[in-house]
Swiss-Prot record:
PTM note: Deiminated on Arg-4 in granulocytes upon calcium entry. Monoubiquitination of Lys-120 (H2AK119Ub) by RING1, TRIM37 and RNF2/RING2 complex gives a specific tag for epigenetic transcriptional repression and participates in X chromosome inactivation of female mammals. It is involved in the initiation of both imprinted and random X inactivation. Ubiquitinated H2A is enriched in inactive X chromosome chromatin. Ubiquitination of H2A functions downstream of methylation of 'Lys-27' of histone H3 (H3K27me). H2AK119Ub by RNF2/RING2 can also be induced by ultraviolet and may be involved in DNA repair.
Residue(s) carrying N-acetylserine: 2
UniProt GO cellular component terms: extracellular exosome; nucleosome; nucleus
Modified residues (N6-(2-hydroxyisobutyryl)lysine): 6, 10, 37, 75-76, 96, 119
Main location per the UniProt record: nucleus
Biased composition (Basic residues): 7-19
Residues modified as N6-(beta-hydroxybutyryl)lysine: 10, 14, 37, 96, 119
Name the record gives this protein: Histone H2A type 1-J
Length: 128
């Protein structure tokens, strides 16, 4: 009658998460909320949580890739803290980044000092 109401109005577009817009698995909305609640700054830009989520996702993927390789080397199909420890400590850059981090149930890297190894003598080769 008077042209009011929702006749012929456009249907609202399907909601799309910021993570899917950015092509990420990590939750951009949650990272944004945590940045706002954490009192890091008075205001948080729209791109900051996307960038931070992307960085966190990349680091996680890198560590899991190396830990998966460590698990496969040990003939295991499940990644355990020991595999994470081996992955991080054997990678120079990750070891520097996570140098002060302790991983529970991670153990230590196998390492025997060179002076403790048996000496290789050539006495039995020269028996003339």
């Amino acid at each position: 009658m008077s042209g009011r109401g929702k006749q012929g109005g456009k249907a609202r577009a399907k909601a799309k998460t910021r993570s899917s817009r950015a092509g990420l698995q990590f939750p951009v909305g949650r990272v944004h909320r945590l940045l706002r609640k954490g009192n890091y700054a008075e205001r948080v830009g729209a791109g900051a949580p996307v960038y931070l989520a992307a960085v966190l996702e990349y680091l996680t993927a890198e560590i899991l890739e190396l830990a998966g390789n460590a698990a496969r080397d040990n003939k295991k199909t499940r990644i355990i803290p020991r595999h994470l420890q081996l992955a991080i400590r054997n990678d120079e850059e990750l070891n520097k980044l996570l140098g002060k981090v302790t991983i529970a149930q991670g153990g230590v890297l196998p390492n025997i000092q060179a002076v403790l190894l048996p000496k290789k003598t050539e006495s039995h080769h020269k028996t003339k």
